[in-house]
Amino acid sequence: MNENSRLHTHSNIRNTFFSEIGIGISGNSFLLLFHIIKFFRGHRPRLTDLPIGLLSLIHLLMLLVAAVIATDIFISWRGWNDIICKFLVYLYRSLRGLSLCTTSMLSVLQAIILSPRSYCLAKFKRKSSHNISCAIIFLSVLYMSISSHLLISITATPNLTMNDFLYVSQSCSLLPLSYLMQSIYSTLLVLREVFLIGLMVLSTSYMVALLYMHRKQAQNLQGTSLSLKASAEQRATQTILMLMTFFVLMSIFDSIVSCSRTMFLDDPTSYSIHIFVMHIYATVSPFVFISTEKHIVNILRG
């Protein structure tokens, strides 16, 4: 029997994981509810409200699906068939892809918002909400098509033990792919990661440069209105910068743990670390956004 199937005996790992999932679901639910109430009350929406609300919804759904899959990892039973396995795993991977796409587009959108009127990026401010929505849809469809191989390779775990199967949960396993298919899939996945994370790095570098210029200009002119404007822009941008940095670090850590898991297929420790690391960003990000919302902070302080 694969050693990963014994994870249900590790109570500390189980409790830690479900605590992480519970905190993440609570945070994303609160953030999503805040944006829904804000919309129905007629508050003027900011350009970043749509992607932030969408990101909280994606993370909420992803964590809920992860909680369902986790019951098949940490609770000793095997009751899922091929259809349930394919649906849950494909849905989960698609939501992870949506999270990456939306995070990347949020970084680009903040860079557009921060751009002065004289810059070429400022031309996209009026249509940025529409353009970002179209970009997210396009990238999401593209990623879901890349992950479509899971509809074939994910299967219910056979009764006979086979070392070639990669453990997903007690009921579900990943069929080994041919060298050609694995190479194609890995190449497409790497291209997607490089492209989207590259957008984050470029937009982040652009925002850092603009913030530095704003600060220098404010110091030279000693203007109150400019200082206040720069301060407001700094708060919004620093939140995005912090999330982008955190996301990139977690992506790198995730890749390292994933590679170590591939090298040591029967190591339950690497698998437990992997499933914990995969959800850190989705758990932490809503609280970062909540901490920057003045209305929420004032209510909590009051």
Swiss-Prot record:
Extracellular side: 1-16, 71-91, 153-193, 260-269
Membrane topology value: Multi-pass membrane protein
Glycosylation site positions: 159
Compartment(s) where it occurs, according to its Swiss-Prot or TrEMBL record: Cell membrane
Disulfide links within the chain: 85-172
Consequences of knocking out this gene: Mice lacking all but one V1ra and V1rb gene (12% of the V1r repertoire) show a lack of chemosensory response to a subset of known pheromonal ligands and changes in maternal aggression as well as male reproductive behavior.
Primary subcellular site in the record, as a coarse category: membrane
GO molecular function ontology, one term from the record: pheromone receptor activity
Any Pfam family hit: V1R
GO-annotated biological processes: response to pheromone; sensory perception of chemical stimulus
Entry GO terms, CC: plasma membrane
InterPro entries per record: GPCR_Rhodpsn_7TM (IPR017452), Vmron_rcpt_1 (IPR004072)
Transmembrane portions of the chain: 17-37, 50-70, 92-114, 132-152, 194-214, 239-259, 270-290
Cytoplasmic face residues: 38-49, 115-131, 215-238, 291-302
Record-stated family: Belongs to the G-protein coupled receptor 1 family.
Function: Putative pheromone receptor implicated in the regulation of social and reproductive behavior.
Protein name per Swiss-Prot or TrEMBL: Vomeronasal type-1 receptor 48
Organism: Mus musculus (Mouse)
Lineage start: Eukaryota, Metazoa, Chordata, Craniata, Vertebrata
